[in-house]
Each structure stands twice: as structure tokens, then as C-alpha cells.
Design a protein with these regions (language model features):
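Single-pass alpha-helical membrane anchors
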Residues: 1-9
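Terminal connector regions
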Residues: 94-149
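N-terminal low-complexity, acidic/Ser/Thr/Gly/Pro-rich segments
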Residues: 20-29, 90-95, 149
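Short coil-to-beta strand junction motifs in C2/discoidin
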Residues: 51-57
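Intrinsically disordered, low-complexity Pro/Gly/Ser/Thr-rich segments with frequent PxxP/GP/PP motifs
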Residues: 59-108
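Asparagine-centered strand-capping/turn motif at beta-strand->loop junctions
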Residues: 43-50
């Protein structure tokens, strides 16, 4: 019981002090089936203890409804105390069917996206949000939704 309390305290410290950053969100591909969004992930650990963190699963929503998520991974990282660690790039394939309510707004933008990688998802002008889920020291954590900029 004491062990679980210690682990929960560690998760609370992660929640309060650590910062997960999504860096360089971008459109990487536009196809007939949908579009691919990618972002680089890093974690700041300002605490004095190391953390074991799973690779985050990023979920995209539009208008509060599920659109797509990244593929879960068993990959884990040890985040050293008082450091920023890069966790790599996460890619999410968003099918056009998830964007159907917004297709009239997208039709005019799609030609400008084809063949141009690296554009910000903000170019889509859609109400897209993301949140991530991650295990920290074997305890589950889900972030609050944030608008994709």
C-alpha cells in the first residue's frame, strides 16, 4: 500500500512539475485517404528523481469528437532528473471521413496542401484539438485537450 502511495505521489509530481511539449506540429502528407500530422515530443523533468515514461499516444479530436490517434508503442524512456528529453516524433493519420463535417471548408485548401510538407495544421483552419496519454512510473496519465496550432 505504501508502494502505491509513493507511485501516486510520483505521478502527482509529474503532473504538477513536468512539462510535455509538442514541438513543430506539421502536415507531413496528404493522400486520397486522409492527411498525416506529425509532432516532435519532449518532456521536461525539473524534479530531483528520474521518471520512467512510455511513448505518448496522441489523440486528435475535431469538435470534441474522436478523429484519429497515433499507434501505441511499448517503447519507454527514462527521464533523468532536471533535464529535457526528446521522445522522438509521433505521427497521426487522420482519415477524411473524420473531417467530413468540415469538408466544404477544406475543399479549397486541399490543392495548396498537396506536395507541400511541413505546413502547420493551422493552415487547415479546423477546430482540431489533441491530447496525449502516457504511463509515468507505470501509472496512467491523460493530458487536458489543447488546440492544435
Amino acid at each position: 500500500m505504501l508502494y502505491l502511495g509513493f507511485k501516486a505521489f510520483g505521478l502527482n509530481r509529474f503532473n504538477v512539475y513536468s512539462v510535455v511539449r509538442t514541438l513543430n506540429p506539421r502536415i507531413t502528407k496528404v493522400t486520397l485517404t486522409g492527411l498525416s500530422l506529425a509532432t516532435d515530443i519532449s518532456i521536461d523533468n525539473p524534479t530531483n528523481t528520474s521518471l520512467k515514461v512510455s511513448k505518448p499516444v496522441v489523440t486528435i479530436t475535431t469538435g470534441g469528437k474522436y478523429a484519429a490517434s497515433s499507434v501505441p508503442s511499448t517503447e519507454t524512456f527514462t527521464i533523468a532528473p532536471q533535464t529535457r528529453s526528446a521522445l522522438g516524433t509521433i505521427e497521426v493519420e487522420v482519415p477524411w471521413t473524420s473531417l467530413t463535417p468540415y469538408i466544404s471548408n477544406l475543399v479549397s485548401r486541399i490543392p495548396s496542401l498537396i506536395g507541400k510538407t511541413g505546413q502547420s495544421p493551422a493552415a487547415l483552419d479546423l477546430p482540431m484539438e489533441y491530447y496525449y496519454t502516457v504511463y509515468v512510473n507505470d501509472l496512467f496519465y491523460q493530458s487536458s485537450p489543447e488546440k492544435i496550432a
